[in-house]
């Protein structure tokens, strides 16, 4: 499901799993957990479709590199009408393009 579709009526997608790509910002590790903002659609650094808080109970390993795009598998949560993601898995290439 696309971000724009979910953003229109987030409650309809409560508990659904999505695989969204983008970039990470404002990352914080607290104990064994990890939280950040996912800049949905910003993998090519051209256009941000939306900002979504993303939380992992266990910090991803290896650590996410904020300088490179990611794809996350996460469950949609809704709080006060806003989309939140409960992360399950992260895909991030080990090398940057051209390395």
What are these regions (language model features)?
Residues 1-99:
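OB-fold and OB-like single-stranded nucleic-acid-recognition modules
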